[in-house]
């Protein structure tokens, strides 16, 4: 009887050990997100998508606080910290596009990487291990100028335009800016000024610029910076955005038309694609995110409400 009891107990113990070691029990992967100005509410809709994907994929996602991150070196320090902490993958929007080659090489030698909103000026490196989730910057910039033309016509001779371009150290912003400049030039418009920098820097510069006929903002931060200026001088404001301030200004009629990237899908797909790479290494994938043209008249349609105010936002 004693021998039988010992045998049964041994079987139970071995079964328990096997269960604990069983490969069918999945690991909970940890993913880190490092984007500029992460505390800005322009990321709220992106974070909603991240949270839903996190629940569906059963992963942990850490959106790193990037307050005070002003240079690529600052960002690299945060990246290194996450790698030391054992992150399984990094979702990164670089604060600057130049000189990123070595940073990318270093990251992919240590963990998985997905580039967000980043078409870096790094054509000489192997991108096979780097997925991207991004906008088509030329398309969205072209569509933005079309919105202006739809309202004021295509002949902009003798018209002056001001452009707010936030961070021109990012390749994506340069693409938008160059596209808008080329189209406006062909339409005969005079570009009065191009203001860039942080939100506070742009607001300060706007105190000293000439008053144009139209203002264009090339991202959420740019639009935020131009709202008070446009309201003060009753200037039509157009742009690419989606922050809470942007949406309020659209509702008030300060922003005439706004192109809103589907940030929820961007967040969701970024996490989903990263999980796929962690589990099943694959050839490089690039996903292009849609955007929507929204104005005061259509902002509360069923589709546009879901873009501006996603569930859980």
Regions found by a protein language model. Give the residues of each.
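Structural motif
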Residues: 62-84, 192-210
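Flexible loop/hinge segments that line or gate small-molecule binding clefts
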Residues: 99-139, 243-251
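Hinge/cleft segment of the Venus flytrap/periplasmic-binding protein
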Residues: 265, 269-313
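Hydrophobic membrane-insertion alpha-helices, especially the h-region
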Residues: 2-17
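Extracytoplasmic "Venus flytrap"
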Residues: 32-48, 53, 62-72, 95-97, ...
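Hydrophobic alpha-helical
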Residues: 94-109, 113, 194-247
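Short, solvent-exposed amphipathic alpha-helices that sit
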Residues: 42-57, 140-144, 168-189, 266, ...
């Amino acid at each position: 009887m004693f021998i039988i009891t010992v045998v049964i107990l041994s079987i139970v113990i071995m079964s328990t050990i096997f269960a604990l070691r069983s490969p069918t029990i999945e690991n909970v992967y940890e993913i880190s997100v490092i984007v500029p100005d992460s505390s800005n509410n322009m990321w709220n809709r992106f974070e909603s998508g991240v949270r839903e994907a996190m629940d569906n994929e059963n992963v942990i996602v850490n959106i790193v606080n990037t307050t005070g991150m002003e240079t690529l070196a600052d960002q690299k320090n945060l990246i290194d910290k996450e790698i030391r902490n054992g992150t399984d993958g990094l979702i990164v929007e670089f604060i600057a596009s130049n000189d990123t080659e070595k940073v990318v090489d270093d990251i992919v030698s240590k963990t998985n990487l997905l580039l967000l909103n980043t078409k870096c000026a790094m054509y000489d490196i192997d991108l096979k291990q780097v997925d991207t989730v991004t906008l088509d910057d030329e398309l969205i910039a072209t569509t933005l100028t079309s919105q202006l033309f739809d309202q004021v016509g295509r002949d902009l001779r003798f018209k002056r335009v001001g452009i707010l371009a936030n961070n021109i150290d990012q390749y994506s912003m340069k693409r938008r800016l160059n596209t808008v400049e080329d189209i406006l030039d062909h339409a005969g418009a005079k570009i009065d000024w191009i203001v860039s920098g942080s939100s506070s820097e742009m607001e300060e510069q706007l105190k000293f610029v000439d008053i144009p006929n139209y203002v264009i903002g090339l991202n959420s931060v740019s639009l935020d910076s131009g709202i008070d200026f446009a309201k003060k001088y009753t200037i039509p404001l157009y742009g690419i955005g989606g922050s809470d301030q942007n949406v309020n200004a659209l509702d008030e009629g300060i922003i005439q038309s706004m192109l809103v990237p589907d940030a929820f899908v961007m967040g969701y797909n970024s996490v989903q694609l990263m999980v796929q790479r962690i589990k099943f290494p694959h050839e490089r994938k690039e996903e292009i995110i849609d955007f929507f043209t929204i104005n005061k008249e259509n902002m509360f349609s069923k589709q546009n409400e879901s873009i501006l105010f996603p569930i859980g936002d």
